Amino acid sequence: MNGTEGINFYVPLSNKTGLVRSPFEYPQYYLAEPWKYKVVCCYIFFLIFTGLPINILTLLVTFKHKKLRQPLNYILVNLAVADLFMACFGFTVTFYTAWNGYFIFGPIGCAIEGFFATLGGQVALWSLVVLAIERYIVVCKPMGNFRFSATHALMGISFTWFMSFSCAAPPLLGWSRYIPEGMQCSCGPDYYTLNPDYHNESYVLYMFGVHFVIPVVVIFFSYGRLICKVREAAAQQQESASTQKAEREVTRMVILMVLGFLLAWTPYAMVAFWIFTNKGVDFSATLMSVPAFFSKSSSLYNPIIYVLMNKQFRNCMITTICCGKNPFGDEDVSSSVSQSKTEVSSVSSSQVSPA
């Protein structure tokens, strides 16, 4: 094995060098130069400085403006809550540990940080699954004219949290474990060792199969069918022009959110699975750290996407920031946009479609 396994850690460097020390007790500057840890600090600070306010503002705007409290927006709020979990309980911890060059909070802190990072990512993924299924049912109409109600939205949210806990909780209960990864200043599930006491292999297969492959397949199936349906409707003029436009644009927004998530998390998933299937392979701490830290950027994608692509939401956010006034004068435009979307709302009971 080209790494060193401890009681509750795995350092990707052989102890033949005599340099390896516990990542809970000593700086890990033998894995990467100190300046690389400072770069991580700057990057995480940027995510905290931008992600925390924009997700809090997303929640504030949604609760303040009654017209935004539509069933499909509940899922978007759920995404914002997941991103806040990651920012508050994941990013802040990673910033401090990277600043010190090792996981200063010990094994318990590592388990907590790994849990919240996994939980936040899973809530985001399963929320996108719910959005994809909603788009498929509303646009493709396999169940007729389906009305997406508040009850359906709350059921979807409950489902996302159930699935997320079923992924993030097992390592806290003895099925696998959370250990420092990469540069040893953030934590994740143990993809690295074959420790029989924790049954790591079965957990990793379960996690990749149930909590990555299946959701991604459902998302791609839903949007594959949806794109075909939108094209058919456009060719046959089955819907009014305004309804077609609104459905296309809300679909485009959700697809961008899915692509943003996949862009952030797929590199991490692929590198982790490669390490898992090639136990003992020689890899640098940076190899795992780069995709691990890049995956955290997903907390910025979703609010930016639906603020940029949803004119009504964007207008509400600007008026909230500017104390009730929109200096860009979009109120009238937003009102007309909202009016034109009532046809979509009558089907999906939602007004998230952008203009």
Swiss-Prot record:
It is found in: Membrane. It comes from the Eukaryota. Residues 332-355 are annotated as: Disordered. The chain crosses the membrane at residues 37-61, 74-98, 114-133, 153-176, 203-230, 253-276, 285-309. Glycans are attached at N2, N15, N200. GO terms for molecular function: G protein-coupled photoreceptor activity. This is Blue-sensitive opsin. The lineage of its organism: Eukaryota, Metazoa, Chordata, Craniata, Vertebrata. It is a multi-pass membrane protein. Phosphorylated on some or all of the serine and threonine residues present in the C-terminal region. Residues 62-73, 134-152, 231-252, 310-355 are cytoplasmic. The keyword DNA-binding does not apply. Keywords: Chromophore, Disulfide bond, G-protein coupled receptor, Glycoprotein, Lipoprotein, Membrane, Palmitate, Phosphoprotein, Photoreceptor protein, Receptor, Retinal protein, Sensory transduction, Transducer, Transmembrane, Transmembrane helix, Vision.
